[in-house]
Amino acid sequence: DGIVAKDGVRAAFDLYYPSSDSVRQALAADFADQMRQIGIEVSPRGASWDDIYPHQYSSPVLWGWGSNSPVELYQLTHSKGWGNYACYDNAEIDAHLDQARAARTVENSYEPYRKAQWDEATQTGVAPQGASTWVWLANIDHLYFQRDGIAIAQQKPHPHGHGWSLVNNVDQWDV
C-alpha cells in the first residue's frame, strides 16, 4: 500500500483536530495526503476538545498557536512549559529560555531566544533543523474591513485568531 515499515511497524499515526473547525479539518486532510506521498499514513481524527485532550501527550494534535510574544516559545518547548505536549526535555534549551526570560532588557533576551531555536555552535535547538518539536503547517491570513478615512498603521504578522493583534498599534492609526 506504499506505507513504509521498519521491523514490522508501519509509519502510521492518528492526527487529532477539533471537528468543529473546518480549517483544521482541511489542514489535517491535506497533511495526510502529503505524508502518504512519502510513505507515512496519517489518519485525521475529528473530535471534541474533551475527546482530544486525553491524546495530547501521545498523539499529534492540530493546535492553533501563534503569538508575537516569545513567551509562547517558552511554554511550548521548555521542559516545564504548560504547552510542551511533545514532552521535550533538553537542559541546554531550558537554560537558553531561562536566560532569555531573566534578561533585564528585551534586547538582551534576543540572543538566548535565538539559541533556544537554533544554536549553530552546539547544533541544538527546537527549530526544524534541530529537535523540531512542532510541525508548523500554515499561517492563516486574516481579512479585515476598514472604514474610509482610517489609515491603519503597518501591521506585523497576526497570529492565531485571538489576541486582537490588529489593535496592538492603535495609537499609530490616523483617524
Which positions does each model-derived feature cover?
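Detector for C-terminal structural segments
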Residues: 23-33, 52-175
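Ligand/substrate-recognition segments at binding pockets and active sites
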Residues: 1-67
